[in-house]
């Protein structure tokens, strides 16, 4: 079912923001999706900042452009970096340091907490003895999907990633990804020869894996691993995302580039605030 926010246009969002500005004197934080809103609500001061659901990156960018034209102060947009920064620089538009917020969460101790909650200690130790740390194994399995997404965007291939799916290419017992089968399926969806698609993939510039991996891919892949190789549960991608957000520590957020960008925006836009005045430097004991 399509969310109503996904049906908004940038112009409609700007009208909504203008009306909200008349009723709310604090900062307006314009965000892409519902999971972004849930994340930020745990890290902002509600009395000083109101998250606004935009329904996509394009709407955030469009709305911020209108704000930059001099409409009013105190509005900040935050978007996922995806495969590159926004095309037009704006002091009121920030992006994540990696592909998206999930990449930030999965690189933090929140992943360790999720593995304790949903994984099996013995199975995880056995897996890591053979294949290395779960975090590195996860990003290695997410990267082929990320490279396909990047390729599809760069060459306008129009690969339908919902139809492509994720689970058909994994051996659930070993959590092993069949990259050749994945590439062949993607080639079919974009009516290309598999050999040609492999050549295009090989020609992509180098990029850090965490910049390539899409958060929802990673959550689904982690869920597949927890089914047998890492555990005996199937929490589902949605619950895993929620658990990561809840387990994410404030002191880890304060060490991120995104946090520093927000603080810099606050300094330029006083008296508008987004974050608490002080965040503990270490996690509570």
PLM region spans:
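Acidic, divalent-metal-binding catalytic cores of TOPRIM
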Residues: 1-285
